Amino acid sequence: MNLINIAIDGPAAAGKSTIARRVAESHSMIYVDTGAMYRAITYKYLQEDKNDDFQALIEDVSLKLVYDEDKGQRVLLNGEDITDYLRSNEVTQNVSYVASKEPVRTFAVKVQQQLAAEKGIVMDGRDIGTVVLPDAELKIYMIASVEERAERRQKENEENGIPSSLNELKKEIEARDHYDMNREISPLRKADDAITVNTTGKSIEQVTDIISDLIDKVEA
């Protein structure tokens, strides 16, 4: 079997991370959560009292992704495991702003491309198929309704002990979509050769099966 890279892009809470992780497990591939990288840098930004000197911020950042058999992917920032802090409301509310900055984007893309160099990677984000891995053998553009995405985010927040309002989450997701699609650097958009997968009303297993079928066709 030839090793391939899979790029999964799409808006917030479309199911990218959950599906990417499941696909990687079922095909013995390595999952790379690029969103966690940007959240880690955002966490650092917040620790630095929102200092907007992003070049200086990046120069003081060392990111490492490690894989724990029980806990899955963990994110180490300057040697400290900060994974459990990455889904906080404060990080979520600031990550789009931080991720849009050129020094941050350049740093993260370089790390992501290094991770994918040996192939066998499933990577999800906003600009994987368009910027990070433009030569990926399979590109997926994952979408879902705002309503369902808000419900998923609320459930995720509840599991992490974070209270949230469904209506507020809808507004946040719509605002995030607008920001991501209209930012100057690496805006969210579907790659010309990406295949759209709508996850609305579908189970994790159903979406995983759809993508597995696409993988089989690429590898055939």
Curated annotation (Swiss-Prot):
InterPro entries: Cytidylate_kin (IPR003136), Cytidylate_kinase_dom (IPR011994), P-loop_NTPase (IPR027417)
Positions annotated to bind ATP: 10-18
Top-level enzyme category: transferase
Catalytic activity: CMP + ATP = CDP + ADP; dCMP + ATP = dCDP + ADP
GO biological processes: nucleobase-containing small molecule interconversion; pyrimidine nucleotide metabolic process
Residues covered by region (Disordered): 150-169
Subcellular location: Cytoplasm
Family, per entry: Belongs to the cytidylate kinase family. Type 1 subfamily.
Protein's recorded name: Cytidylate kinase
Species: Staphylococcus carnosus (strain TM300)
